Amino acid sequence: MLLCDIGNTYLHFYQEGKVWKELPRRLKAGMEVQEVYYISVNPPSARRLLEVYPHAIDLAPHMVLDTAYKGLGVDRMAACKGIEDGVVVDAGSAITVDVMQNQVHLGGFIMPGIASFSSMLKSISPALEKELNLSVELSALPQNTRDALSYGAIKAIVMMIQNSCKNKRLFFTGGDGKYLARFFENAIHDNSIVFKGMLKTLEEMKEGKR
Amino acid sequence: MLLCDIGNTYLHFYQEGKVWKELPRRLKAGMEVQEVYYISVNPPSARRLLEVYPHAIDLAPHMVLDTAYKGLGVDRMAACKGIEDGVVVDAGSAITVDVMQNQVHLGGFIMPGIASFSSMLKSISPALEKELNLSVELSALPQNTRDALSYGAIKAIVMMIQNSCKNKRLFFTGGDGKYLARFFENAIHDNSIVFKGMLKTLEEMKEGKR
């Protein structure tokens, strides 16, 4: 069985505990796979997956989450189902932060991803076109432009996550998940959280719940 | 005497306590003005000003601020000189936050402006193309995409300013200065802070300090 989480940039795959990613244009038919399940926030990439695996099944219509949130993306739903309790941060092109309590989704928010901060600043002024310094000191006021931009992006993201997690367990996934996790004690970094939510949905389908 | 603060988007003018702004392409020769002083972070717009006021004098070489910060923009320098003590937030296309203590600059940071958050999120995914909700509730977890985006931008900006100001006085200027000031008790909104710093520089020049 092959699982695929189709994001804004990459297609993320999961098979027997292994996780990898591909750009849509680099996607090639892999081994013969009997079952392929996917979720997608990117229709062109989903069409690309279906060219390669025409029998792939979209899990979105089967995914149910207890929430008052209107229009929650299917990837965030899967991440929430994947943790059941705590705060899940999916740090990719965008950073989503969602709070779960006893399998109930309490709400969440969206920030630009780290790379987006860079490109956003660049578009304001060429003077702000700097590679972010990922090692910037967050406890002292910056003393140059590159650090000022890095601090303004990274500290903002870190403080927003801190503010949302209080005493809850904190889970990180996505391309910048590992980097962000190191700002927090006891944070869990796990690139299979979304897939765990997809597997849970499959179990629920088999149990006839959905 | 006419003062001009040339930003990334607008030219901001000051004359006899009045403040107004113009887009560079809409700039027309005004009344006869004997003295014109300017600062600029935008060379094409500065050239445009000099077409209209060929005798305008750049204050940048005369502006001195006690700081360890390398490469501080001349507009931030002027804002710092304009407050002397406290935290000054200039909220335009970019948001700059600078901390002053007894006329000494302790450092500062840069975040994308509110409009930049919007356009950045739009560029990540069409699903994130929403006008920000400037009245979003910052004390409860968002329950829809538009609020999730607004909360992720506005709360991040507000928390970063809060974190930097501690017990210091807080000054706001720039296009979104008035909006942001309302999140803080006793914040001062003043669209002439940068001009006050320019006037201070002129005084110093006359006193022969520079």
UniProtKB/Swiss-Prot annotation, chains A, B:
Family: Belongs to the type III pantothenate kinase family.
InterPro entries according to UniProt: ATPase_NBD, Type_III_PanK
Pfam families listed in its UniProt record: Pan_kinase (PF03309)
Active-site residues annotated for this sequence: D75 (proton acceptor)
Protein name per Swiss-Prot or TrEMBL: Type III pantothenate kinase
Subcellular location(s) of the protein: Cytoplasm
GO cellular component: cytoplasm
GO molecular function: ATP binding; metal ion binding; pantothenate kinase activity
Pathway as given in its UniProt record: Cofactor biosynthesis; coenzyme A biosynthesis; CoA from (R)-pantothenate: step 1/5
Annotated EC: 2.7.1.33
Keyword Transferase: yes
Function: Catalyzes the phosphorylation of pantothenate (Pan), the first step in CoA biosynthesis.
Catalytic function, reaction form: (R)-pantothenate + ATP = (R)-4'-phosphopantothenate + ADP + H(+)
Binding site for substrate: Y69, G73, V74, D75, R76, T145
Keywords of this entry: ATP-binding, Coenzyme A biosynthesis, Cytoplasm, Kinase, Metal-binding, Nucleotide-binding, Potassium, Transferase
NCBIfam families the UniProt entry points to: baf, PRK13333.1
PANTHER family: TYPE III PANTOTHENATE KINASE
Details of cofactor binding: A monovalent cation. Ammonium or potassium.
Binding-site list for K(+): D90
SUBUNIT field: Homodimer.
Highest taxon in the source lineage: Bacteria
One record GO biological process: coenzyme A biosynthetic process
Amino acids binding ATP: D5, I6, G7, N8, T9, Y10, L11, H12, S93
Cofactor section: NH4(+); K(+)
